């Protein structure tokens, strides 16, 4: 059993169309490095819901990356549509990891009314981690260590958190990032992808959106590729 936690924002107490973002980096941030603050969307007449995915931020359970998102997306959509503040319309937004959470769900899940993944990937090989068979070393390890640092923080492993931070700030992770991932997040996606990229028989996973979802209005700006 686990509980998913989200923050809601709207300007008045009445039913509104919902804008939903599901992300692993802390719902307080809400991707505001690239998107307007949720209060801006709320001022335009939306109920904005920013949710921490399973095992991240305030949500319970263990974080296992993309593998958990189809079932949790379905549950979240059902919950959002049941909110008294929701008028029945649901749109999703966010890029990168937040983009993929918009596209995968359990079979039979009703689609949202519109989808805005902006820039994301489906193939964990070609879209998320490698170029021409070569692993995105700087990007992949840096992102993996970001998630490993969040894991250490959640577990109150401050020694590990400080070691990861020092390596990121000094750029030492470019040399010993593989060892840090093995030490602090061996089950994480980045470490698994790194090892798969050097395997002679890699078993890469490609995520497949439901056909009914792809018939809905969808805004994809950067294509099926995530080099962010």
Summary of predicted features, one role per range:
Residues 1-11:
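Single conserved hydrophobic/aromatic residue that forms the stacking wall/gate
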Residues 84-97:
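Alpha/beta-hydrolase fold nucleophile elbow
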Residues 227-228:
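Conserved alpha/beta-hydrolase "acid-adjacent" motif
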Residues 35, 43, 104-108, 112-213:
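Accessory cap/linker subdomain of secreted extracellular hydrolases
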């Amino acid at each position: 059993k686990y509980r998913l936690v989200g923050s809601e924002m709207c300007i008045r107490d009445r039913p509104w169309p919902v804008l939903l973002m599901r992300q692993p980096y802390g719902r307080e941030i809400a991707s505001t490095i690239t998107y307007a603050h949720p209060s801006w969307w709320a001022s335009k007449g939306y109920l904005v819901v920013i949710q921490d995915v399973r095992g991240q931020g305030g949500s319970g359970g263990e974080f296992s990356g993309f593998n958990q998102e189809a079932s949790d997306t379905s549950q979240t959509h059902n919950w959002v549509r049941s909110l008294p503040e929701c008028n029945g319309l649901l749109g999703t937004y966010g890029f990168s990891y937040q983009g993929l959470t918009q596209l995968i769900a359990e079979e039979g899940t009703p689609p949202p009314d519109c989808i805005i993944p902006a820039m994301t990937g489906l193939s964990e090989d070609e879209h998320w981690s490698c170029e021409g068979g070569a692993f995105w070393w700087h990007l992949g390890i840096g992102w993996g260590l970001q998630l490993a640092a969040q894991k250490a923080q959640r577990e109150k492993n401050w020694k590990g958190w400080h070691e990861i931070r020092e390596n990121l700030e000094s750029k030492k992770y470019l040399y010993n990032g593989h060892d840090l991932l093995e030490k602090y997040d061996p089950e994480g996606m980045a470490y698994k992808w790194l090892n798969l990229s050097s395997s002679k028989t890699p078993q890469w996973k490609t995520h497949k959106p439901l056909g009914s979802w792809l018939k809905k209005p969808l805004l994809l700006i950067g294509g099926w590729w995530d080099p962010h």
